[in-house]
């Protein structure tokens, strides 16, 4: 049996992942045409490269169809309930940094904290008859965060792209989204609440707790020796 490792199929995440493994003596490369999403691993026997979208990798790890996967820590926490029971964090990779934050219109001069947001949400509902809308694609993470911080009288509305524009377009009053520099937020006249860092994300190498490791432990031992990573006892 081979050890299957899922890697983002395109863009900077794929390039940075290839670089990270390559610096440790494990060469990953695409094979065939660019859109075939097939690849190979050189330097370690018995390792199969599976190219997937970053959003698919948590699901494949949770289902046990791949043994290892590189994806954002935000995506694993969002897509897998009780994520730590389904996967183990093997190594932070030091790239793909971004923060999941909550932002409101910059002209809300009296709203700077989560307590302020809670008060504004209550006032909004009293004035308009419906809950304040927060646009996001991170429903699980944002809901858990707001609940833990006592924010009520809001509703999450789904946004799978251009979330920063939802306030300007009138489909939401606030947003919860990933940002690296904050430039896009400022361009859309939004400000980050001072205490609303939901999650600080980066690319992480994860191991599946649901995969069959009985015959993959050998290839992982060879791979782990290159990477300086032991196989967690819970996975054997």
UniProtKB/Swiss-Prot annotation:
GO biological process, one term: L-histidine biosynthetic process
Cellular compartments per GO CC: cytoplasm
SUPFAM superfamilies, sorted: Periplasmic binding protein-like II
Superkingdom, natural source: Bacteria
Biological or metabolic pathway of the protein: Amino-acid biosynthesis; L-histidine biosynthesis; L-histidine from 5-phospho-alpha-D-ribose 1-diphosphate: step 1/9
Signal sequence bounds: none
Pfam families reported in the protein's UniProt record: HisG
GO molecular function: ATP binding; ATP phosphoribosyltransferase activity
PROSITE patterns per UniProt: ATP_P_PHORIBOSYLTR (PS01316)
Enzyme Commission identifier(s): 2.4.2.17
Main location (coarse class): cytoplasm
Subcellular location: Cytoplasm
Keyword Lipoprotein appears in the UniProt entry: no
Keywords: Amino-acid biosynthesis, ATP-binding, Cytoplasm, Glycosyltransferase, Histidine biosynthesis, Nucleotide-binding, Transferase
The reaction(s) this protein catalyses: 1-(5-phospho-beta-D-ribosyl)-ATP + diphosphate = 5-phospho-alpha-D-ribose 1-diphosphate + ATP
Function: Catalyzes the condensation of ATP and 5-phosphoribose 1-diphosphate to form N'-(5'-phosphoribosyl)-ATP (PR-ATP). Has a crucial role in the pathway because the rate of histidine biosynthesis seems to be controlled primarily by regulation of HisG enzymatic activity.
Recorded family membership: Belongs to the ATP phosphoribosyltransferase family. Short subfamily.
Entry's free-text remark on domains: Lacks the C-terminal regulatory region which is replaced by HisZ.
Subunit structure, interactors included: Heteromultimer composed of HisG and HisZ subunits.
Name of this chain's protein: ATP phosphoribosyltransferase
Native source organism of the sequence: Cereibacter sphaeroides (strain ATCC 17023 / DSM 158 / JCM 6121 / CCUG 31486 / LMG 2827 / NBRC 12203 / NCIMB 8253 / ATH 2.4.1.)
Organism lineage: Bacteria, Pseudomonadati, Pseudomonadota, Alphaproteobacteria, Rhodobacterales
Gene name of this polypeptide: hisG
